[in-house]
Amino acid sequence: MTDVTIAVPVSVRFFAAAQHVAGTPAAELMLGPGATIADAIAELCGQSDEIALVLQKCSYLCDGVAVRDLRASLRPHQTLDVLPPFAGG
């Protein structure tokens, strides 16, 4: 039997300062099986030191639900929203 590795495609949407440092409003990640939200963030942080600094301060939504545990597993085709701190009214 062959070992089949299935990638986990995840959509990422960046907002405000996160979008600015990412240089794009959205990105697609291909993560390994069993990938967690922390793995997705680590993949994004690897793109630049600047984005890594911003992502440390962000909150995250996964399919519209606030992320409380970065160790939560991602399923294929989920959407991760990256929300930096907002100010104003």
Locations of the language-model features?
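Ubiquitin-like/PB1-type beta-grasp interaction modules and other compact soluble beta-rich domains
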Residues: 1-88
